[in-house]
Amino acid sequence: MEMKKKINMELKNRAPEEVTELVLDNCLCVNGEIEGLNDTFKELEFLSMANVELSSLARLPSLNKLRKLELSDNIISGGLEVLAEKCPNLTYLNLSGNKIKDLSTVEALQNLKNLKSLDLFNCEITNLEDYRESIFELLQQITYLDGFDQEDNEAPDSEEEDDDDEDGDEDEEDEDEDEAGPPEGYEEEEDDDEDEAGSEVGEGEEEVGLSYLMKDEIQDEEDDDDYVDEGEEEEEEEEEGLRGEKRKRDAEDDGEEDDD
């Protein structure tokens, strides 16, 4: 399938300015040149044209937002200065499996100031003595060459980098929320709840206290009643005793009169 047809198929009824990623791998470049891609793809951030028999970048449109460019397994041998002119914000460039042979060809990438990762794997240039040291010296802005930095530490996967960025954004949002504190009125509501709870407890204690006092009063009244009852019984017993003595004296007096 030709590149122009492949582009139309990948659009899927979208306008070119709505596309941020475009994969055109394994299609065919007529005469080894880019066709069907133009300046209307101004929002493009990722472009892949791997194994499309591309030999020239002369017809590459201006893509100022492009960050990642995949050009592996083509027949590019030069003309890399176009990249700095058309895609000045590139951070990742894959030229592995192309016809790049010498350092002078790569030197054109010095003007890509934001370039961090470059792949030249399976290019003839990798057979040069001190290849890695020479590239890092020539392109001092890059961090990773063929997937590794100067200390042979492997480059993070691009998807992991994206995830880290998202996690970083979420952490920042959480920190912002923590710094902002609780929403307005939140503390006041808590205080109101505590006051209500306190008043409920106070009312409960008052009710318990009242009931306790009422019980004491009732008990005191009962005790007073018992005391009154006991007093009345004692008075009755005393009165009966007095009446008994009086009857006894009356009987004795009657006896004395009979004797007379």
Swiss-Prot record:
<dbReference type="InterPro" id="IPR032675">
    <property type="entry name" value="LRR_dom_sf"/>
</dbReference>
<dbReference type="InterPro" id="IPR001611">
    <property type="entry name" value="Leu-rich_rpt"/>
</dbReference>
<dbReference type="GO" id="GO:0098978">
    <property type="term" value="C:glutamatergic synapse"/>
</dbReference>
<dbReference type="GO" id="GO:0005634">
    <property type="term" value="C:nucleus"/>
</dbReference>
<dbReference type="GO" id="GO:0140713">
    <property type="term" value="F:histone chaperone activity"/>
</dbReference>
<feature type="repeat" description="LRR 3">
    <location>
        <begin position="65"/>
        <end position="87"/>
    </location>
</feature>
<feature type="domain" description="LRRCT">
    <location>
        <begin position="123"/>
        <end position="161"/>
    </location>
</feature>
<dbReference type="GO" id="GO:0005737">
    <property type="term" value="C:cytoplasm"/>
</dbReference>
<comment type="similarity">
    <text>Belongs to the ANP32 family.</text>
</comment>
<feature type="region of interest" description="Disordered">
    <location>
        <begin position="149"/>
        <end position="260"/>
    </location>
</feature>
<comment type="function">
    <text>Histone chaperone that specifically mediates the genome-wide removal of histone H2A.Z/H2AZ1 from the nucleosome: removes H2A.Z/H2AZ1 from its normal sites of deposition, especially from enhancer and insulator regions. Not involved in deposition of H2A.Z/H2AZ1 in the nucleosome. May stabilize the evicted H2A.Z/H2AZ1-H2B dimer, thus shifting the equilibrium towards dissociation and the off-chromatin state. Inhibits activity of protein phosphatase 2A (PP2A). Does not inhibit protein phosphatase 1. May play a role in cerebellar development and synaptogenesis.</text>
</comment>
<keyword id="KW-0433">Leucine-rich repeat</keyword>
<feature type="compositionally biased region" description="Acidic residues">
    <location>
        <begin position="149"/>
        <end position="208"/>
    </location>
</feature>
<protein>
    <recommendedName>
        <fullName>Acidic leucine-rich nuclear phosphoprotein 32 family member E</fullName>
    </recommendedName>
</protein>
<feature type="repeat" description="LRR 1">
    <location>
        <begin position="18"/>
        <end position="38"/>
    </location>
</feature>
<dbReference type="GO" id="GO:0030672">
    <property type="term" value="C:synaptic vesicle membrane"/>
</dbReference>
<keyword id="KW-0832">Ubl conjugation</keyword>
<dbReference type="InterPro" id="IPR045081">
    <property type="entry name" value="AN32"/>
</dbReference>
<keyword id="KW-0143">Chaperone</keyword>
<keyword id="KW-0677">Repeat</keyword>
<feature type="repeat" description="LRR 2">
    <location>
        <begin position="43"/>
        <end position="64"/>
    </location>
</feature>
<feature type="compositionally biased region" description="Acidic residues">
    <location>
        <begin position="218"/>
        <end position="240"/>
    </location>
</feature>
<feature type="cross-link" description="Glycyl lysine isopeptide (Lys-Gly) (interchain with G-Cter in SUMO2)">
    <location>
        <position position="68"/>
    </location>
</feature>
<dbReference type="GO" id="GO:0000812">
    <property type="term" value="C:Swr1 complex"/>
</dbReference>
<comment type="subunit">
    <text>Component of a SWR1-like complex, composed of EP400, KAT5/TIP60, TRRAP, BRD8, RUVBL1, RUVBL2, ING3 and ANP32E; the complex does not contain SRCAP. Interacts with H2A.Z/H2AZ1. Interacts with the importin alpha KPNA1 and KPNA2.</text>
</comment>
<dbReference type="GO" id="GO:0042393">
    <property type="term" value="F:histone binding"/>
</dbReference>
<dbReference type="GO" id="GO:0098839">
    <property type="term" value="C:postsynaptic density membrane"/>
</dbReference>
<dbReference type="GO" id="GO:0098895">
    <property type="term" value="C:postsynaptic endosome membrane"/>
</dbReference>
<feature type="region of interest" description="ZID domain">
    <location>
        <begin position="207"/>
        <end position="260"/>
    </location>
</feature>
<feature type="repeat" description="LRR 4">
    <location>
        <begin position="89"/>
        <end position="110"/>
    </location>
</feature>
<keyword id="KW-0007">Acetylation</keyword>
<dbReference type="GO" id="GO:0031410">
    <property type="term" value="C:cytoplasmic vesicle"/>
</dbReference>
<keyword id="KW-0597">Phosphoprotein</keyword>
<dbReference type="Pfam" id="PF14580">
    <property type="entry name" value="LRR_9"/>
</dbReference>
<keyword id="KW-0539">Nucleus</keyword>
<dbReference type="GO" id="GO:0019212">
    <property type="term" value="F:phosphatase inhibitor activity"/>
</dbReference>
<keyword id="KW-0963">Cytoplasm</keyword>
<keyword id="KW-0156">Chromatin regulator</keyword>
<keyword id="KW-1017">Isopeptide bond</keyword>
<dbReference type="GO" id="GO:0006325">
    <property type="term" value="P:chromatin organization"/>
</dbReference>
<feature type="compositionally biased region" description="Basic and acidic residues">
    <location>
        <begin position="241"/>
        <end position="251"/>
    </location>
</feature>
<feature type="modified residue" description="N-acetylmethionine">
    <location>
        <position position="1"/>
    </location>
</feature>
